[in-house]
């Protein structure tokens, strides 16, 4: 079953197209790793798929509320404990997987610590543990292993495998080999947007502010 389908997508940063014609599909039980040089638009593409900004062109198809997005920022409530952070998100998504998330990301010993007191790596593990309590089938992950040591990377890779085995899917932008031999790789370099004079898609501000608000 296809959980995410992207068809001829053009995405922009600062009003300028950065990627165009991006097409791929992601089925249940599968993972896709995005690769490409810094600045090519991996984060912009992920933000667009997560619904944080509109595409310039193209189509994205997915189940309603199908995506759980983990950005560079961990999105933690600093004054809440590790457990309370997960309980907060579990309540929002009406799930009962806090214990699983704590165990999967090796956070049991830290469950009563305030998020503000955690190290960078511990905060990252907690941020990723949030994925486990969303109950959403498609994980969209932007450099998920930043600040993680080798042991924590292995924990995260195992969490991804378990998610795939349960019928989920994962889309990741990462330069680190997670050991997921089953993951496909999509190089974004061929989708780098052409300038308008070379036939590329015009950006949101190419006609000035008057045109943008018509």
From Swiss-Prot:
Record-linked Gene3D superfamilies: P-loop containing nucleotide triphosphate hydrolases
EC main group = translocase
Main localization of the protein described in the UniProt heading: membrane
* Annotated GO biological process: cytochrome complex assembly
| Family annotation (InterPro entries) | AAA+_ATPase (IPR003593), ABC_transporter-like_ATP-bd (IPR003439), ABC_transporter-like_CS (IPR017871), ABC_transptr_haem_export_CcmA (IPR005895), P-loop_NTPase (IPR027417)
Q: Where is the ABC transporter domain?
A: 4-214
Q: How does it sit in the membrane?
A: Peripheral membrane protein
What is a single molecular function from GO for this protein?
A: ATP binding
Annotated EC = 7.6.2.5
- Which Pfam families would you find in this protein's record? ABC_tran
Q: Which family does it belong to?
A: Belongs to the ABC transporter superfamily. CcmA exporter (TC 3.A.1.107) family.
What is the protein name stated in its UniProt record?
Cytochrome c biogenesis ATP-binding export protein CcmA
- Gene for this chain: ccmA
């Amino acid at each position: 079953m296809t959980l995410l389908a992207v068809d001829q997508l053009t995405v922009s940063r600062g009003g300028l197209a950065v990627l165009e014609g991006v097409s791929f599909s992601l089925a249940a039980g599968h993972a896709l790793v995005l690769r490409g040089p810094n600045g090519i638009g991996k984060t912009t593409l992920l933000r667009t798929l997560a619904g944080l900004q509109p595409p310039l062109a193209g189509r994205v198809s997915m189940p309603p509320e199908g995506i759980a997005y983990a950005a560079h920022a961990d999105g933690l409530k600093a004054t809440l404990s590790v457990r309370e952070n997960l309980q907060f998100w579990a309540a929002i998504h009406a799930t009962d997987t806090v214990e699983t998330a704590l165990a999967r990301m090796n956070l049991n010993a830290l469950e009563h610590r305030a998020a503000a007191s955690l190290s960078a790596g511990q905060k990252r593990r907690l941020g990723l543990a949030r994925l486990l309590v969303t109950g959403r089938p498609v994980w969209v992950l932007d450099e998920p292993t930043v600040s993680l040591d080798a042991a924590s990377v292995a924990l995260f890779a195992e969490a991804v495998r378990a998610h795939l085995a349960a019928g989920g899917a994962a889309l990741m932008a990462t330069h680190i080999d997670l050991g997921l031999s089953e993951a496909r790789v999509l190089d974004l370099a061929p989708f780098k947007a052409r300038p308008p004079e070379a036939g590329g898609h015009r950006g949101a501000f190419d006609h000035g502010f008057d045109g943008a608000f018509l």
